[in-house]
Swiss-Prot record:
Disulfide bonds: none annotated. Belongs to the bacterial ribosomal protein bL34 family. It comes from Mycobacterium sp. (strain KMS). Pfam families: Ribosomal_L34. HAMAP family: Ribosomal_bL34 (MF_00391). GO terms for cellular component: ribonucleoprotein complex; ribosome. The lineage of its organism: Bacteria, Bacillati, Actinomycetota, Actinomycetes, Mycobacteriales. One of its GO terms (biological process) is translation. This is Large ribosomal subunit protein bL34. Keywords: Ribonucleoprotein, Ribosomal protein. Coiled coil: none annotated. One of its GO terms (molecular function) is structural constituent of ribosome. InterPro entries: Ribosomal_bL34, Ribosomal_bL34_CS. It comes from the Bacteria.
Length: 47
């Protein structure tokens, strides 16, 4: 039985562009995400 390829192919540049800090700061909702994580005391705010 043939299985498909693994779906997670790590790529740091894509990770940063899709989930990164600059992207989060671009929208109001993204800033809300970062604010919430700051308030919660998360060590890592974004990817």
């Amino acid at each position: 039985m043939a299985k498909g390829k693994r779906t997670f192919q790590p790529n740091n540049r894509r990770r940063a562009r899709v989930h990164g800090f600059r992207l989060r700061m671009r929208t109001r909702a993204g800033r809300a995400i970062v604010t919430g994580r700051r308030r919660k005391g998360r060590r890592s705010l974004t990817a």
